[in-house]
Amino acid sequence: MLKYIIPTIMLMPLTWMSKNSMIWTNTTAHSLLISLTSLLLLNQFNDNSLNFSPMFFSDPLSTPLLILTMWLLPLMLMASQSHLLKEPPTRKKLFITMLITLQTFLIMTFSAMELILFYILFEATLIPTLIIITRWGNQTERLNAGLYFLFYTLMGSLPLLVALIYIQNITGSLNFLMLQYWTQAVSNSWSNVFLWLACMMAFMVKMPLYGLHLWLPKAHVEAPIAGSMVLAAILLKLGGYGMLRITTILNPLTEMMAYPFIMLSLWGMIMTSSICLRQTDLKSLIAYSSVSHMALVIVAILIQTPWSYMGATALMIAHGLTSSMLFCLANSNYERIHSRTMILARGLQTLLPLMAAWWLLASLTNLALPPTINLVGELLVIMSSFSWSNITIILMGTNIMITTLYSLYMLTTTQRGKYTHHINNITPSFTRENALMALHILPLLLLSLNPKIILGPLY
């Protein structure tokens, strides 16, 4: 794993030593190189000894998430350029350094071998994200959003630390590969119920579970574009990854404890989708749609069948690319119109025809149109939940319908209709923006040709 961690760290001196005119070019080009080399990880499924050490390892579950993490850094740099146009060079370099630090922490989190190391890095990702939101956010409420983000996540993950120390005392090891062979079944005594809740809560807050999701719309709306992208695409997946890793250890307790959480997720999925239909703020709509998609992932992970695990990993990757692309599109609107209100940004299809094509593609992938991998993930989750309980098909069907409705509502509000008079003189879309959208949509389309590489360890 060091062949990805060290080049990423070396991007920092590159940033600070670059000429002011070359800051963006250098960092974007080199981070793109790193992300292209990360594709080599896909080859190593059969022979994992190649990327295996006492500290870091990668397996078919973490590999797609690692590649997604590395793929996103150049995209974040490309998206942030006009946001930081008026800042002095030192601040630009500081911003890029924050992104690189976050990237390094994330790579190490997804490949951590020990649960305590995973926990430390899981918490370390908070710091750069918080600085990005509170320093480079758009509105004055960004400090409030940062506080929400910090305290929700910290309150969730303190019990996890206690639980991990307790598991360490019982088993003598917190190694992921060792814990799989922990043969003693976890009985359903009261103390073990609390142990399960402590282990799960941190990841449930991060996902976020409906009811613990209030930090997410706030953080998304106030964050700068890079913050929104990394939050939607990767930080939410940390919760899913942690749950996938830890539920297998806590069997058979999970089977008993999962019921209330599955019910809450199914209810929250419908509720947040319905909230999307009434949103006026574009970023807020995309944030709530993230909550409803992640609720599906929570359901899939808690059902614990091979199909649902495959569906969860596929959905996480698909949602990461889709929501990141939607945030980029919302940001390109915001940079031209200086408002996130959807009513003010209507009728843009006549002014920016190519952008309208990207909007159409992004909305269609968001509503899981065949043949995208969003559909693959959703189908696997729906089938596994149907075999778990037949009634869920009604809820899933309702959710699909509402998702389609709000995706098309978002598309028609921003692109169709008579455009308002205050947007007569907007700049056309840049090549940079078109390249950014293409780099989001290409993986989505190419993965639909071979979805098995993102279906996780059970395929």
UniProtKB/Swiss-Prot annotation:
GO CC field: mitochondrial inner membrane
One Pfam family from the record: Proton_antipo_M
Enzyme category, top tier: translocase
Location of the protein in the cell: Mitochondrion inner membrane
InterPro entries from the UniProt entry: NADH4_N, NADH_Q_OxRdtase_chainM/4, NADH_UbQ_OxRdtase, ND/Mrp_TM
BP terms from Gene Ontology: electron transport coupled proton transport; mitochondrial electron transport, NADH to ubiquinone; mitochondrial respiratory chain complex I assembly
Annotated EC: 7.1.1.2
Transmembrane segment boundaries: 22-42, 60-80, 92-112, 113-133, 147-167, 193-213, 224-244, 257-277, 284-303, 308-330, 351-371, 391-411
Entry's Gene Ontology molecular function annotations: NADH dehydrogenase (ubiquinone) activity; ubiquinone binding
Annotated catalysed reactions: a ubiquinone + NADH + 5 H(+)(in) = a ubiquinol + NAD(+) + 4 H(+)(out)
Keywords, alphabetical: Electron transport, Membrane, Mitochondrion, Mitochondrion inner membrane, NAD, Respiratory chain, Translocase, Transmembrane, Transmembrane helix, Transport, Ubiquinone
Keyword Glycoprotein: no
Main localization category: mitochondrion
Membrane topology, from the record: Multi-pass membrane protein
UniProt similarity note: Belongs to the complex I subunit 4 family.
Quaternary assembly: Core subunit of respiratory chain NADH dehydrogenase (Complex I) which is composed of 45 different subunits.
Function: Core subunit of the mitochondrial membrane respiratory chain NADH dehydrogenase (Complex I) which catalyzes electron transfer from NADH through the respiratory chain, using ubiquinone as an electron acceptor. Essential for the catalytic activity and assembly of complex I.
Protein name: NADH-ubiquinone oxidoreductase chain 4
Underlying gene: MT-ND4
